[in-house]
Amino acid sequence: LIVTGCAAQIDPMGFSKMSEVDFVLGNSEKMRPEIWSNLASGAPVESERVQVDDIMSISETASHLIDGFGTRSRAYVQIQNGCDHRCTFCTIPFGRGNSRSVPAGVVVEQIKRLVQKGYNEIVLTGVDLTSWGADLPTHPKLGNLITRILRLVPDLNRLRISSIDSIEVDEEFLDAIATERRLMPHFHLSLQHGDDLILKRMKRRHLREDAILFCEQVRKLRPEVTFGADIIAGFPTESDEHFENSIKLVEECGLTWLHIFPYSKRDGTPAARMPQIDGRIIKSRAELLRSLGKKVRSKHLKEQIGRKHKVLMESSVLGRTEQFAEVLFSSPKQ
């Protein structure tokens, strides 16, 4: 039994104490082909049961050069890993390390290969996607990469962006939203909360007004755009008034897709030392936000009835609109 991933990176000794665990591999070590080759061949792996290096010392990220995804029509391309920010509730930087970007040329070549294999949509992914390029020569921005991909891969039908931090979105990114129809009009925002005091205690870099203005700005550029968001319920010190501001933010930003996280204390984080909210209250608030999420999603979907949409088929009966809404067909499509 081999344990790897962020939990193993953060607490390797905890897993090594489990008698059923044979090896513990860090996030860097799991990318070493020789380890897996030795396991597959039955050859002995290095003597140490725990092989976890200092993730903060890693300065490069290995791009996931995947040539196919079975019968899927959508492919995911990792362009960035790690995070340089230190939100008070989060342990991701200690599991993934500092922000590291895949060079633009490598990204473009991977996308070209996937398009040649018939993939119609590419999704750019990363831990902190909008920080892409900060560690590369000349410090290019994400908007530059988007523009380059769309220019150099003309046969790509759809380019989709995964979760972004709106405060880091650059002008070239905004220009692409306004002018490039192949850039899909759906953006998932890392908002986390709707109250300024809680945002400061989270050590986020934006305020609620920043989020509202960003959504308004993008809607002016691309009226058909939709937004999703991550929101945490029950962060330490969150009062009823603070929570109500998260509820209001859903309407003020016009969000249609909500990803709700009940706050979960992570040992060693600053938030873990703050006054905690009762678990029953956290659960109740998360349920309220999820209920609101279902309501706004249903409203958006009902508004699409009778409208024409371009749909990318994922199977003979299932597809997605450009805004990522799911479409079910009553009979199989070729």
Model-derived features: where do they sit?
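Glycine-centered loop/turn positions within well-structured domains
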Residues: 31, 85, 130, 196-197, ...
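A generic structural signal for well-ordered coil/turn residues at beta-strand boundaries
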Residues: 71-73, 183-185, 257, 307, ...
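Terminal RNA-binding accessory module
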Residues: 273-334
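Conserved SAM/AdoMet-binding glycine-rich loop
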Residues: 10, 116-240
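Residue-level signal for inorganic ion chemistry
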Residues: 6, 33, 124, 161, ...
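Contiguous mid-protein beta-loop-alpha structural module that forms a pocket-lining wall or clamp
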Residues: 238, 253-255
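Proteins enriched for Cys/Gly/acidic motifs involved in redox and nucleic-acid/cofactor modification
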Residues: 1-132, 147, 172, 187, ...
